[in-house]
Curated annotation (Swiss-Prot):
SUPFAM superfamilies: Acylphosphatase/BLUF domain-like. Signal peptide: none annotated. It is an enzyme of class 3 (hydrolase). This is Acylphosphatase. Keywords: Hydrolase. InterPro entries: Acylphosphatase, Acylphosphatase-like_dom, Acylphosphatase-like_dom_sf, Acylphosphatase_CS. It catalyses: an acyl phosphate + H2O = a carboxylate + phosphate + H(+). The keyword Repeat does not apply. PANTHER family: ACYLPHOSPHATASE. The active site is at residues 18, 36. Belongs to the acylphosphatase family.
């Protein structure tokens, strides 16, 4: 199991990007959350099996049909939050 935090920048608000992220996460059995930030970015935290999480993050980096991801900063977190599901916050 691994736990990641990511900040995604680009055209990621107002284009259904959080719903895209949630759908990808749920389809892959990931746990965590995604939300818009006040700065116009999208933030997420995700937990799951290592390869599944890494594949999920690659898909998020590619973006949805209506989004345009220009940057994605990621960090692996040392502790687990034991999320129950994957939800959209805020």
């Amino acid at each position: 199991m691994i736990h990641y935090h990511a900040i995604i920048t680009g055209r990621v608000q107002g284009v259904g990007f959080r719903y895209f992220v949630q759908g990808e996460a749920v389809n892959r059995g990931m746990k965590g959350w995604v939300r818009n930030t006040d700065e116009g970015h999208v933030e997420l935290k995700v937990e799951g099996e290592q390869q599944e999480v890494l594949d999920f993050l690659k898909t998020v980096r590619k973006g949805s049909p209506f989004s345009k991801v220009t940057d994605m900063q990621m960090e692996q977190l040392p502790e687990f939050a034991h999320y129950q599901d994957f939800r959209i916050k805020g």
